[in-house]
Amino acid sequence: TKYRFVFYARPNNLRNLFYLGIQVINSAIQQQILNLDQWEIIFVGKDIPDVTIDDGKEPIKYQNLNWSEYAQLAGTVDLGLSLMCTPHPSYPPLDLAASGAVVVTNRFSNKQDLNCYSANLICADPELHALVDAIRKGIALATDPVAREQNFINNKLSTDWNQSLKDVIQVLSTNY
């Protein structure tokens, strides 16, 4: 079975850096970092155009998934590439890390390091060479089941709504 590489692909949302992501994937393939004999390439998002990756193959595309389909897919991902030119991490990197995947994302403004959530989240500067190097690191981590699982076990991503909303509920119940 092949490992699963997922790219969060939203070309009509410029903040998602779709075309940089395509360059990163192609460069990683050209440099034999991302070996298509070992990795299945999947694009997930909306309005994904017909594209071919470096070797002329078309990626598998999933568009407009409902939440159940998205959650089911997230649980099968080994490595994700999710770019977002915003100061917040966005949902896909956190969703994928919470599902056990390793994720490469970009730095921006105050978003420099996401280890506070998970050691399976790798941040790199939003430029080709830095992101390709992060893909290299991501592949090494995604294919190391012991390190990847240990990072997942040590995730600081809360799955308990009561815990997550505890402070908010406290403030609201005290002030209102």
Predicted regions mapped to residue ranges:
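Short hydrophobic beta-strand element within catalytic cores of glycosyltransferases
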Residues: 102-106
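A charged, aromatic-enriched C-terminal amphipathic alpha-helix characteristic of glycosyltransferases
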Residues: 126, 140-176
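Nucleotide-sugar-dependent
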Residues: 83-93, 107, 112-115
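Short alpha-helix at the nucleotide-sugar/activated-sugar donor binding site of glycosyltransferases
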Residues: 96-98
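Acidic donor-binding loop of glycosyltransferase active sites
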Residues: 72-88
